Amino acid sequence: MSEFARQVETLRPQLMRFARAQLRNDAWAEDAVSETVLAALEKPQSFGGQSQLKTWLVGILKHKLVDQLRRHSREASL
């Protein structure tokens, strides 16, 4: 495991707390965090180091949270 991957994994619990607070659903939160970690690990070069790693990951997570809400609101309306 690379140092970058270790740093990302170290932040997973903080990302989970944020996602749970926003979504109020553990399964949805876990999905959003997993998608965030995957996106970060697939393109580590996207992290330019201009901010803290946590700030960058939370930015990705916010987009994934919106995706989760959209996905589940569509399912609820079906």
Feature-to-residue mapping (PLM):
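A short, charge-rich alpha-helical start-of-domain segment used by transcription regulators
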Residues: M1-R17, A21, A27-E30, L41
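Residue-level preference for hydrophobic side chains embedded in well-ordered alpha helices
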Residues: Q7, L11, L15, T36, ...
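Short loop-to-helix capping motifs
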Residues: N25-D26, Q50
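Acidic active-site catalytic centers that drive phospho-/nucleotidyl reactions
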Residues: D31, E35, D67
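Sigma70-family region 2
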Residues: E35-L53, R71-S73
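Arg/Lys-rich amphipathic alpha helix in sigma70-family domain 2
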Residues: G48, G59-L78
